[in-house]
């Protein structure tokens, strides 16, 4: 049997990504990272995407209550090796502990823009016009 050639993540990648997300969230919630920026910010880890070989974990995070996300992302990336070390006890089943990279999650901003577009008068008028025809 041949492997599928699609670029969609495998079930294993999704499962491991969710486990890594939960482990990173626990490390951040416990306050194990000693950094003023990280300790003063509530950080939401929305998704972790694993590379196909499971050696790189890209964590998409949203710092809440901070206008400049780049400062928090830089602080997280500075402490990525420490966080990686703290993931070990929770991810014992993995042969290699993944390298963790933090990225800003812009999906909430994208959802907000789409919602604003759907609520705009032009789109509302078009949607109402579709209902009149039916």
Curated annotation (Swiss-Prot):
Domain of life: Bacteria
Location (main, coarse): cytoplasm
Subcellular localization: Cytoplasm
Keywords, alphabetical: Cytoplasm, Ribosome biogenesis
Record PANTHER family: RIBOSOME-BINDING FACTOR A, CHLOROPLASTIC-RELATED
Subunit structure: Monomer. Binds 30S ribosomal subunits, but not 50S ribosomal subunits or 70S ribosomes.
Protein name: Ribosome-binding factor A
Species this protein is from: Rhizobium johnstonii (strain DSM 114642 / LMG 32736 / 3841)
Gene assigned in the entry: rbfA
């Amino acid at each position: 049997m041949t492997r599928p050639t699609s670029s969609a993540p495998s079930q294993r990648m999704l499962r491991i990504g969710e486990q890594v997300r939960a482990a990173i969230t626990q490390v951040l919630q416990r306050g194990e990272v000693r950094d003023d920026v990280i300790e003063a910010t509530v950080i939401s880890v929305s998704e972790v995407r694993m590379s196909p070989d499971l050696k790189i974990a890209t964590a998409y995070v949203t710092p809440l209550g901070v206008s400049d996300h780049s400062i928090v992302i830089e602080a997280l990336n500075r402490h990525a090796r420490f966080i990686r070390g703290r993931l070990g006890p929770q991810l014992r089943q993995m042969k290699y502990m993944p390298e963790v990279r933090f990225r800003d999650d812009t999906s909430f901003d994208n959802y907000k823009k789409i919602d604003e577009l759907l609520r705009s008068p032009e789109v509302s008028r078009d949607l109402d016009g579709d209902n009149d025809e039916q």
